[in-house]
């Protein structure tokens, strides 16, 4: 009997092209489809504590934050905005709820943008004209930030709860009011704690407008839960070309949000990769403590921005092959580790020296990339892939 196996299916396509949006500037950071997707976070300091706020902004900047947001619930916070905006190395957005007067305070202070929550600012619709005029005069954008937890009562009454349709209708209604006053320097967010609702809302929004979109799963939770929720939601949207800025909301220090956000973008090849550690889940074949080895190598290379592929392998099944394919790697077994550089074994070291040796060799490769191959090589390597550390 003849069997027709047919032709193999074509592989699934890669990421969709970026959704075409209007372009805007948040300080010196471009936002929109012509620009790299930016990563944001929000200070957890009291904004009126200028020193503490600037210190946290400096930490976020070092971690790779592109844009930072600060709260402004009180007049003393508004009074501090000018100094914060003046000394911050990255653009400062002011987050406004309840009191419209703080919108104008933020604009007057020279902040790079203002986020407004139309669901809880008093009589906001009637103040849109004033806000549009002030923002236009200052040349700054407005983010219309709709949130499931504070949805405009009109849309809550209409839909019964914060559905994706309710979030989108609220955002587009407010945007239309700004447009009536000739102001289109707008970006939008429609955040929900449920990634499924959030994804649906952004997909609907993307189909109905060309505003840049700021992605976020609101109240995502502690680090593990929030990372999973954000990665799932952002991956679903970014793979379709939807999203121009992101914030990973975590119940954790803000620097953790930046680490996760950057890693999400790197994993989708939407940002040049730094080093990456690929490690297996371990099994009964492993002849070293894979978890300990992977964590120690990761900690030792923390902050390394050069794209190196580093393989840390725990057994002989995939170890030698993975190590040979990497820029740098180790295949471990019998209390020893074979160190590979560019596919060649350069030495064998005792297990206790594996981490130290890998870090030394990584630094040597970084030095060679800078002095012998030049910045063009680094740029090309960054585009083609990331430094990968593989632990099997």
Swiss-Prot record:
Region (Disordered): 371-392
EC number: 1.17.7.3
Catalytic activity: (2E)-4-hydroxy-3-methylbut-2-enyl diphosphate + oxidized [flavodoxin] + H2O + 2 H(+) = 2-C-methyl-D-erythritol 2,4-cyclic diphosphate + reduced [flavodoxin]
Enzymatic class: oxidoreductase
Gene3D superfamilies: Dihydropteroate synthase-like, Sulfite Reductase Hemoprotein, domain 1
Name of the molecule in the record: 4-hydroxy-3-methylbut-2-en-1-yl diphosphate synthase (flavodoxin)
GO terms of biological process kind: isopentenyl diphosphate biosynthetic process, methylerythritol 4-phosphate pathway; terpenoid biosynthetic process
Chain residues that bind [4Fe-4S] cluster: 280, 283, 315, 322
Cofactor(s) the protein requires to work: [4Fe-4S] cluster
Keywords noted in UniProt: 4Fe-4S, Iron, Iron-sulfur, Isoprene biosynthesis, Metal-binding, Oxidoreductase
Gene transcribed to yield this protein: ispG
GO MF: 4 iron, 4 sulfur cluster binding; 4-hydroxy-3-methylbut-2-en-1-yl diphosphate synthase activity (ferredoxin); 4-hydroxy-3-methylbut-2-enyl-diphosphate synthase activity (flavodoxin); iron ion binding
Function comment: Converts 2C-methyl-D-erythritol 2,4-cyclodiphosphate (ME-2,4cPP) into 1-hydroxy-2-methyl-2-(E)-butenyl 4-diphosphate.
Cross-referenced HAMAP family: IspG (MF_00159)
UniProt similarity note: Belongs to the IspG family.
Basic and acidic residues: bias regions: 371-380
Biased amino acid composition, Polar residues: 381-392
Organism of derivation: Mycobacterium leprae (strain TN)
Cofactor, free-text remark: Binds 1 [4Fe-4S] cluster.
Protein's pathway: Isoprenoid biosynthesis; isopentenyl diphosphate biosynthesis via DXP pathway; isopentenyl diphosphate from 1-deoxy-D-xylulose 5-phosphate: step 5/6
């Amino acid at each position: 009997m003849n069997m027709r196996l047919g032709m193999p299916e074509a592989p699934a396509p890669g990421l969709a092209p970026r959704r075409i949006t209007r372009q805007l500037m948040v300080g010196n950071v471009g936002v929109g489809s012509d620009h790299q997707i930016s990563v944001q976070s929000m200070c957890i300091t009291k904004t009126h504590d200028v020193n503490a706020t600037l210190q946290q902004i400096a930490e976020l900047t070092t971690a790779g934050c592109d844009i930072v947001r600060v709260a402004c619930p009180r007049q003393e916070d508004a009074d501090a905005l000018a100094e914060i905006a003046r000394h911050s190395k990255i653009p400062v957005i002011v987050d406004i709820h309840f009191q419209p007067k703080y919108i104008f305070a933020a604009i007057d202070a020279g902040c790079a943008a203002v986020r407004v929550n139309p669901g809880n600012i008093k009589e906001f619709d009637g103040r849109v004209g004033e806000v549009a005029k002030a923002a236009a005069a200052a040349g700054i954008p407005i983010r219309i930030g709709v949130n499931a937890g504070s949805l405009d009562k009109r849309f809550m009454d209409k839909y019964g709860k914060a559905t994706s349709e309710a979030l989108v209708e609220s955002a587009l209604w407010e945007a239309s009011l700004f447009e009536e006053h000739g102001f289109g320097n707008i970006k939008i967010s429609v955040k929900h704690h449920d990634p499924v609702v959030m994804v649906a809302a952004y997909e609907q929004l993307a189909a109905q407008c060309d505003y840049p979109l700021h992605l976020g799963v609101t109240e995502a939770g502690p680090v593990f839960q929030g990372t999973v929720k954000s990665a799932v939601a952002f991956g679903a949207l970014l793979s379709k070309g939807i999203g121009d800025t992101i914030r990973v909301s975590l119940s954790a220090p803000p620097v953790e949000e930046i680490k996760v956000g950057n890693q999400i973008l790197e994993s989708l090849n939407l940002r040049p990769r730094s080093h990456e550690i690929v490690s297996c889940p371990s099994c009964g074949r492993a002849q070293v403590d894979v978890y300990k080895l992977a964590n120690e190598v990761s900690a030792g290379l923390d902050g390394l921005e050069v794209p190196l592929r580093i393989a840390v392998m725990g057994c002989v099944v995939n170890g030698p092959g993975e190590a040979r394919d990497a820029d740098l790697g180790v295949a471990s077994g019998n209390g020893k580790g074979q160190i590979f550089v560019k596919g060649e074994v350069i030495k064998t070291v005792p297990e206790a020296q594996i981490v130290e040796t890998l870090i030394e060799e990584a630094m040597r490769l970084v030095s060679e990339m800078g002095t012998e191959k030049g910045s063009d090589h680094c740029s090309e390597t960054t585009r083609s892939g990331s430094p990968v550390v593989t632990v099997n």
